[in-house]
Amino acid sequence: MLKTTQTSLFIFIGVFLLIFGTDQAIKYAILEGFRYESSIIDIVLVFNKGVAFSLLSFLEGSLKYLQILLILGLFIFLMRQIELFKAHTIEFGMVFGAGVSNILDRFVHGGVVDYVYYHYGFDFAIFNFADVMIDVGVGVLLIRQFFFKQKQNKIKA
């Protein structure tokens, strides 16, 4: 079934709000003091001033504006590539909802609220639900775009 642009926008907004709301609710619990410690994973509060693995933290306050430009640029690009947007509406809703949630943290808290610390066997960077949703959204998009598209092309041939 082919999705109309209006249906795609509705789905995008729904996924966006679900991811954004879930992430902000979890972060609220963390900010209110929820903690957990175990031999595998800890839930602790950290304010990340950079991006993944604290990269670009030297940009400090200007990083949030750079990220806004990046998100707006990507959204404008997607509106011009409407078939790509319609094909990956859910994935883009996940990425945008998570990305905007992390940007909001920068404005409200001075850094992204991170809290998941995996340390079984090795130390891993502290991350949050939004980070996972960005990874899952991009991963599913890449798998669907490259692997399933190649399969479709073979069927058509």
Swiss-Prot record:
What the entry lists under PROSITE patterns is as follows: SPASE_II
Pfam families of this UniProt entry? Peptidase_A8 (PF01252)
Is the keyword Membrane in the record?
A: yes
Q: Does the keyword Transmembrane helix apply?
A: yes
Kindly state which reaction or reactions the protein catalyses: Release of signal peptides from bacterial membrane prolipoproteins. Hydrolyzes -Xaa-Yaa-Zaa-|-(S,diacylglyceryl)Cys-, in which Xaa is hydrophobic (preferably Leu), and Yaa (Ala or Ser) and Zaa (Gly or Ala) have small, neutral side chains
Q: Where are the transmembrane segments?
A: 10-30, 36-56, 58-78, 84-104, 123-143
This enzyme's EC code(s): 3.4.23.36
Task: Tell me the membrane topology, using the record's own terms.
Answer: Multi-pass membrane protein
Catalytic site residues? 114, 131
Q: Which family does it belong to?
A: Belongs to the peptidase A8 family.
Give a short account of what the protein does: This protein specifically catalyzes the removal of signal peptides from prolipoproteins.
Under what name is this protein listed?
A: Lipoprotein signal peptidase
Protein source organism: Helicobacter acinonychis (strain Sheeba)
